[in-house]
Amino acid sequence: MFCYQCSEASKGVGCTTIGVCGKTPDVANLQDLLIWLTRGISYWALKAKEYGVKDDEVNLFVAEALFSTITNVNFSAKRMVEFIERAFELRERIKHRFLEAYAEKEGKTFDEKVPEAAEWHKKGGVDLYELKGMEVGVLFDKDEDIRSLKQLLIYGLKGIAAYTDHAYILKHTNDDILYFIQKGLVETLREDITVDELVSLVLEAGKVAVDAMALLDKANTTEFGNPEITEVYTGTYNTPAILVSGHDLLDLEELLKQTEGTGIMVYTHGEMLPAHAYPKLKKYKHLAGNFGSAWWKQSEEFEEFGGAILMTTNCLVPPKESYKDRVFTTGLVGFDKLTHIPNRTDGKPKDFSPVIKKALELGPIPERKGKKIVIGFAHDQVSRLLDKVIDAVKSGAIKKFVVMGGCDGRHKEREYYTEFAKKLPKDTVILTAGCAKYRYNHLDLGDIGGIPRVLDAGQCNDSYSLVVTALKLKEALGLDDINDLPIVYNIAWYEQKAIAVLLALLYLGVKGIRLGPVLPAFISPNVLKVLVDKFNIAPITTVEEDLKVLLS
């Protein structure tokens, strides 16, 4: 195996024997094959589009397949093989539909040279799939800079795919996004592609990342209402309980409906914390609070929780034997020997009765005292405070906004973000989204004239809210350039959705981003130079030095 898609790449180079995340070599190689096959599917899907042939199932499958390969989503070789077999089926279907349309319109048989990813299929099962995955994986491209840019593009596409898939679950669609994902994948098959062409594609991916986040924002707010300022309890009550982690709000809503009147309290974990701010979800009285913190602490937090646990999307950490029997997966999440809740069929909700049954069998969890944290500062809510915020900026009460969105992770270096937040001057406000918030949302940083010094917009996809807020501030302050705002960026990344957010910021022209805790292993020195020269991206250094630079 060779994998370097997340911030935990072994020794800053890549994982070659087992992923730091827990991904095994067989799964890594199968995922590489699946990604390669999505490129082949995309080749035929784009050809078909030229001839007026569209297959919605094929188009969404490409996004779902990419999503399934994001860090900490799927650890199951069995599930990967199922994806691969389905990829072969759908590739043949869209290929056949294109060839028919081509022959009908052109009056001849299609005879262009076809990339291997659009044709290869041999019988031999999982062993052969693994071998092919090793052959067509990350290291296939020998030129370091071309490889770096192709992987940067692919990882951005994975993030876009994740956000788009979440929107599609809520019946909000955008064909242009899915077709761009396919375009990007097909372009990475080209052996003659240039650095300049790839840089252009990467920036275009940033634009589409904005579109994908906007689509998901519209889906979430249409379905669940605009987030409101909300206090969330972080303790637990002495009742049977279910803990929901991941990102899928519809899964949570369906579970809340199915647990009404059962005596079960439902708690959020990790990136599900923002669910409490949505009016349609907060009306459920048994949505009791948020237990625990960021994804990487789940091994201890899931064990301590004591109730049933539902994992709706990433980030799953390979579970301990001590609590494995009470962890359930659903959607694209995969881990062998965990009970999986099947997808919706015929428009019916998912059946969470196995989770509910387990929670009742386990009985009441311990009561734990907790504090309250304030969330709900998505763009609609912030726009209601905009006059107050503008007045604070103009009066000098707020000198800087510091965007500290992104991901959290297990490495000690991430304590930097807690210290950075603690040492920010009292005339600064943190804008955050994603699980990076857990490094500082428990700190008592106070407020500025009633404006909390930590404004939590929500999940990582709600980085879109931070963008909208920045653009509204730019307009209100009469500025021409987003970089003229009193906003600086200190972004923590972990996986591929954060890469999509980073590309979105670059597309919007944001300069001077500090990125940490480490730079991506897949960024070659020459590609890094392009990013530094064009966007002034820099790695974090020390808290003191970065405060000096960012607040100057």
UniProtKB/Swiss-Prot annotation:
The keyword 4Fe-4S applies. One of its GO terms (cellular component) is cytoplasm. It comes from Thermosipho melanesiensis (strain DSM 12029 / CIP 104789 / BI429). This is Hydroxylamine reductase. Its cofactor is [4Fe-4S] cluster; hybrid [4Fe-2O-2S] cluster. Catalyzes the reduction of hydroxylamine to form NH(3) and H(2)O. Signal peptide: none annotated. Pfam families: Prismane. The keyword RNA-binding does not apply.
